[in-house]
């Protein structure tokens, strides 16, 4: 057998083994319900990933709600797109700027509570297929919201509803109740090299 033929046979065997593993995992997954997803870590891409799922859900005609607990001074591309092109998406932002800009704990707690009150009805409404709670973890880390209340709401949402939570940290309890936890690692970031945030890429 030639060298190329051996490589081809080895590749085919590896792919067949991989397919068997994937098929077995698919066959074993027989429960039908919404999922809880936590996108955390210190790397870039958590919110971007969440909005990718928003686009995916909209492609299937699903009802989507998006709550952003931290809003910077700069308009984001996703905010512009959703408001201009996707009026059916229930979209709400806290609107006080980043908490490290305001430096007013009382005001931030009040804003977090008001924003959470916008999220709660979505988490109780079975007509919502997907709810994104962007940067919610900070509200827990800063103790702006009751962890017990947030955990209870996430655990008791409608069975078919999926929820995506983004942000660094969030605590052990949040990780434990989520079905999928992905940690985005900061390996290298343009900002650290002095490169400005790019419109359409970073915001």
Go through the PLM ranges and name each one:
Residues 32-33, 60, 127, 159:
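Residue-level preference for short coil/turn positions at secondary-structure junctions
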Residues 19-22, 113-117, 163-166:
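Short gly/ser/thr-rich secondary-structure transition/capping motifs
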């Amino acid at each position: 057998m030639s060298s190329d033929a051996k490589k081809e046979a080895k590749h085919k065997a590896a792919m067949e083994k991989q397919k068997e593993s994937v098929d077995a995992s698919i066959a074993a997954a027989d429960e039908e319900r919404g999922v809880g997803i936590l996108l955390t870590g210190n790397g870039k891409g958590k919110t971007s990933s969440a909005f990718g799922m928003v686009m995916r859900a909209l492609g299937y005609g699903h009802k989507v709600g998006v709550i952003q607990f931290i809003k910077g001074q700069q308009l984001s591309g996703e905010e512009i797109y959703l408001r201009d092109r996707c009026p059916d998406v229930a979209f709400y932002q806290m609107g006080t700027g980043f908490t490290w800009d305001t430096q007013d704990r009382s005001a931030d707690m009040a804003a977090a509570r008001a924003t959470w009150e916008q999220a709660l009805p979505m988490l109780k409404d079975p007509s919502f297929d997907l709810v994104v709670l962007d940067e919610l973890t900070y509200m827990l880390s800063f103790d702006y919201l009751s962890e017990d209340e947030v955990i209870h709401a996430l655990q008791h949402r409608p069975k078919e509803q999926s929820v995506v939570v983004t942000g660094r940290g969030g605590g052990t309890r949040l990780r434990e109740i989520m079905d999928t936890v992905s940690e985005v690692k900061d390996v290298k970031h343009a900002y650290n090299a002095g490169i400005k945030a790019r419109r359409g890429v970073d915001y």
